[in-house]
């Protein structure tokens, strides 16, 4: 019976363990489905955030495009103004040259006329009168003919010069406009390129920081896993020792069962039973069998635990190896990125420096060419007007052609540099895309399900990613029927591991999504190997041409005795001075604007103070009129209301009117009495209407007084606001003055220190004095303009103040007239009321 009970108990325990195992398995599957649902939700949230981010980026891009369009329009207007100024200057110079040439021709003709007159006078003195007259007429005719011919020639030359000048001006405007448009486009593209490079640098730095943080995080995870592995190994060793001890005890028990008469068998009986008899053998045997079964169960449990720990140890070691492999892959991935980023930044800096050098050299060469042409034109004087016209036209055409060729070369060089930069950027983006695809393929691969042998059979569980150890360990661990603190600890560790793995996966997924979005924004098209080879060959040819041209220009400058470095330093100093002068002008304009605003605020403040003082004085002089407006009650006449307000309650106006009607219809009265009654009734109705009008005007005046009081309060509030704004403007003006002083000090230091000896050699003392005098004149001019503007603003404000005062006086006069009318109406109404009340009393 005992054996059947034990077997049934064992079967019941086994069924309970199986049920617990199935329940744990179902719980884990439910948790797995919850985690998958959460992952899908997170993916949807990430996609939503990406869409919002793309919308924000699109809005920012549209805003930037709008800003650039506004800037382009402003630049176009500025360029048009500069072009018109230059054309005006060229036109004035050409007109002056033409006037000088005309004066020279007129002087030549005057000299010729004087010579002819001298000849005529000589002939007149030497010969007879007929000869004199003939010669005089012939000379006059010849002079007229020559003058007419010269006049026609001069007119033709003038018309030709005007047409040529018009053509040259049109060509010059077209060329300058195209040049400025292309220069603005190149400048904008260059700035965009610089912004793109800075953005790529920042993104690379962020990516490197993120990778370093991930490496540190994974190192910490590896360290934690190694520590857990050591703990589990110690626990397994301790369990192994317990198993060996239990095996020894089991072997001793079995030997005691085989040899019942041995002293080993007697020792436990003596120790356990004392002085027992020989008939107690069967209970002892039953106890030994129970102990043996218990030991076997414990041994089986310990062996299962050892197998689980060994499997967990193997899984942890595999996971550690995988993490180490990922760390190495991440290091190998971001090192080429760093190298490539450094190479690209160096290449970009070299290209920008080369572009600046080429621009400076082009400017200097064009300037030198212009100076040489001017010198050649000065040396080679024209023999006539036609030669002068032809030489000027040739010089202008040659200069324009040279300028067009130089600008075309500069545009070609800049476009090729931009193409190389775009090619490098596309190569970098292609490498990023390939690495991203490889990483996605690696992340898509999932590990196979882990099969673990347990005490009751085999348990198979599949994990979400590569972390199947915690789930399988939880399913196997449910073999232990009693729940111990070790079980709780292991469950907590497994939950923490799953949460940690889930967080890692979400972080990696978000990082991949960000990288994918950035790649989608940056990648603009596919690459072509032939195009790459062609662009490389073109770049090499352009570099060789540019080097040859630079060498030729340096040789030409060396022949002219110019030093390139000195020219560059001179140009840099000139640019610095121009920048400082522009800053000073900007600050002075800002100062003028602030002064103007401060003056406006002061004027408005004074106006409001004056208005408030006038209102206070008027309130102090004239006491406030207290209008007690009694609203009309429906069904009551104004006379009745006024009588009740005055305290006369005996008279009822409606009854009085009825009585007057009755008296008017009474036949006993005489005609005169009836006429008097009718007139009294009409006068009463008119008085009632008049009183109603008075009440309406009184209400309107009361509303107007309320409006004036509210306006007074508004003026006081505006005064407070203007006081605050005036203080703020004063502070801003002080700051602007300080900034102007600082800029002047900077300019003075730049002129004194940075130029050094070369500036001293360039500028003589006379030129310095001239410069100082010009600066002083400019300052005086600016101050005079500011004073004139302040005076004009003050005059305008005074006119506005006078107009406001006149308006206020008119309103006050109107209010006083209305007050007088109200008083007169009140007096008339009182007189009428007394008259009719007296007449009614006498009549009754």
UniProtKB/Swiss-Prot annotation:
Post-translational modification Phosphoserine, affected residues: 384
Localisation: Golgi apparatus
Tissue specificity annotation: Specifically expressed in the CNS and endocrine tissues. Also detected in other tissues including heart, testis and prostate.
Annotated GO CC locations: Golgi apparatus
Main location: Golgi
InterPro entries xrefs: JAKMIP, JAKMIP_C
Region called Disordered, residue ranges: 250-290, 466-489
GO terms, molecular function: kinase binding; microtubule binding
Compositionally biased region (Polar residues): 466-483
Pfam entry (one): JAKMIP_CC3
Composition bias type Basic and acidic residues, residue spans: 254-268
Stretches assigned to coiled coil: 8-258, 289-421, 493-621, 683-834
Biased composition (Low complexity): 269-282
Keyword list, A-Z: Coiled coil, Golgi apparatus, Phosphoprotein
Keyword Transcription regulation in annotation: no
Family to which the UniProt record says this protein belongs: Belongs to the JAKMIP family.
PANTHER family in alphabetical order: GOLGIN SUBFAMILY A MEMBER 4-LIKE ISOFORM X1, JANUS KINASE AND MICROTUBULE-INTERACTING PROTEIN 3
Name of the protein: Janus kinase and microtubule-interacting protein 3
